[in-house]
Regions:
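Histidine-rich, glycine-flanked metal-binding segment
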Residues: 2-25, 29-73
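Metal-associated gating/positioning segment near the N- to mid-region
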Residues: 57-58, 66-107
């Protein structure tokens, strides 16, 4: 599928017109702009979050229960010295990603 087709799918899924690839129900969505934490359901299409307010009964290939866990954007560590960790970049990623850090600026 070309980029235009993917974009159209993302929009159509966000509008509830086509099924999600995955749906995560019952999460607490952290809005980092307002500071509010609100219940939500996350709809995913082509590996991208397209909505945090999907209906519970929305069609999806895969459905998970988030069991009230928190959903928030990934963190970016803007200052890390990989050499002082005594890990390879891949080893550091194996440790950091499960804890929410998705990117680093390293020297």
């Amino acid at each position: 599928m070309d980029l235009t087709g993917v974009r159209m799918d993302l929009v159509q899924a966000a509008l509830g017109r086509i099924a999600f690839d995955a749906l995560i129900l019952n999460v607490q969505v952290v809005n980092v702009y307002s500071g509010l934490v609100e219940p939500g359901n996350i709809g995913i299409k082509h590996g991208r979050i397209v909505t945090c307010q999907a209906p519970k009964d929305a069609p999806a290939e895969t459905v998970w229960d988030g069991q009230g866990r928190f959903a928030l954007p990934g963190l970016i560590d803007t200052h890390v010295h990989i050499d002082s960790t005594l890990l390879t970049p891949a080893g550091l990623a194996e440790f950091m990603v499960p804890h929410g850090t998705i990117a680093v600026f390293a020297d």
